[in-house]
């Protein structure tokens, strides 16, 4: 007997096309990437540059009292060489030193000149008053061909004191000046180092020369050093200029017996200004608050990569050429329509990391499908909430950096006056520290922005979930399948947070009962397939055994057991 058994399997697929509402955000692939505390190169929807790299190649002086010193060096405004005659007294908001400006005419130098230069740069100008010194028995009109006006002359604010006649003895003298003003006085004097001992004797008589200067806070003695030196401006002698700040009601006393360049007037600094060294053109038609040797930086950004020596109200210098500040959420392209496998938190992680192309009205938005079709709309409330928190982020960053950098600048100002060129190393160290700090601050703000965007999306998602309750089911992709008919007005009520779940509750329950028994989530499909396969095998085995049993019973089959 030949028996053939045919087994057919019937698979029924029940498809539901439920109304659905989804949550997402606007994306626009633009390649804008920022760094956060935990990740580098995170693509975001929007970002703002925080490092300025361009400037105006002019000194913008509109609205400022500008003093362009031209051939005059800034220190020369105190002593008065011929090239500085028009700048002996002035008022300024902006002082411009040129590279070919000169502080002296008779060769020499200012001791601690850079510290004095810093003081003058920050002053708003200079006025002067006579010190009232009178002399007898000596000449006070020493001149030199190195300081020429109509002929040989000397520093306008100094007196070159000489013996009454050549080679005559120079008498011992003492002169004092008391500062009777409320503000400190700047006092400058000089020590003349002759080109030879013979020249010194001719000018001041024979014997050793000594100059002593003292006040309540200052005391110093100076011995001139005659000797042969290379000629500068036709002179082999040198004048060293020294200075001190004389407090109000304090007195300075000079004691000398030759080789002394005496001050004629005391200088008083007034107000505040900015001083820069630059050779670029001055433009009175543009405005600026930040200057450097190459021009004017006009920027509202917190950092700049143009010049570390910029002065004024400036962005702080950093080494980085770019530090992007995120002003929008993380930019993740729209996921394919084919659903991806997700973990336990897929419903949350899914929509946060999924953006929709093409929406320009807002960041956070809804998509829906129903019998009337599909639609997309922005959620302005969530969008505005995020914008309100992100707006002003750049200004807050400026406040943070300005406050910190200003403290550092103030801390090192006094050091600069005391140790001069060591400040160059200090500034380099400050740049290193604050370049790192700037990168860290921007990364922290970027992390906060991205976390904020996720937080606002979570709030929006929870708002929708609490409205729908049992009338809908999350599908793990940031969408809700709604168990009742939801027209455009219904969808609008969900978006506007005016949805009444009780109105649709009965319909939703009925539809849920019909859908749930046949709705298989992806996690159970494999289990049911294996169960079906096992049951089919068992059924085939049972049928085969039944046929064998019937055949044996009716004699159609004999079973012989051999031992």
UniProtKB/Swiss-Prot annotation:
- Say where the lipid (S-palmitoyl cysteine) is covalently attached: 559, 562
- Which residues make up the annotated site Cleavage? 342-343
Q: Can you tell me which residues are glycosylated?
A: 30, 46, 141, 249, 424, 496
Which InterPro entries does this entry report, sorted A to Z? Answer: Capsid_hemagglutn (IPR008980), Hemagglutn_HA1_a/b_dom_sf (IPR013828), Hemagglutn_influenz_A (IPR000149), Hemagglutn_influenz_A/B (IPR001364)
Species of provenance: Influenza A virus (strain A/Chicken/Weybridge H7N7) (Influenza A virus (strain A/FPV/Weybridge H7N7))
Signal sequence range: 1-18
What is the documented function of this protein? Answer: Binds to sialic acid-containing receptors on the cell surface, bringing about the attachment of the virus particle to the cell. This attachment induces virion internalization of about two third of the virus particles through clathrin-dependent endocytosis and about one third through a clathrin- and caveolin-independent pathway. Plays a major role in the determination of host range restriction and virulence. Class I viral fusion protein. Binds to sialic acid-containing receptors on the cell surface, bringing about the attachment of the virus particle to the cell. This attachment induces virion internalization either through clathrin-dependent endocytosis or through clathrin- and caveolin-independent pathway. Plays a major role in the determination of host range restriction and virulence. Class I viral fusion protein. Responsible for penetration of the virus into the cell cytoplasm by mediating the fusion of the membrane of the endocytosed virus particle with the endosomal membrane.
Listed Gene3D superfamilies: 3.90.20.10, 3.90.209.20
Kindly state which keywords UniProt assigns to this record, in alphabetical order. Answer: Clathrin- and caveolin-independent endocytosis of virus by host, Clathrin-mediated endocytosis of virus by host, Disulfide bond, Fusion of virus membrane with host endosomal membrane, Fusion of virus membrane with host membrane, Glycoprotein, Hemagglutinin, Host cell membrane, Host membrane, Host-virus interaction, Lipoprotein, Membrane, Palmitate, Signal, Transmembrane, Transmembrane helix, Viral attachment to host cell, Viral envelope protein, Viral penetration into host cytoplasm, Virion, Virus endocytosis by host, Virus entry into host cell
| Protein name per UniProt | Hemagglutinin
What superkingdom does the record give?
A: Viruses
Q: How does it sit in the membrane?
A: Single-pass type I membrane protein
What high-level taxonomic lineage is stated for the organism? Viruses, Riboviria, Orthornavirae, Negarnaviricota, Polyploviricotina
What's a single GO MF annotation on this record? host cell surface receptor binding
Places the protein is found = Virion membrane; Host apical cell membrane
Tell me, what is an example of a GO biological process annotation in this record? virion attachment to host cell
Q: Name the predominant localization.
A: virion
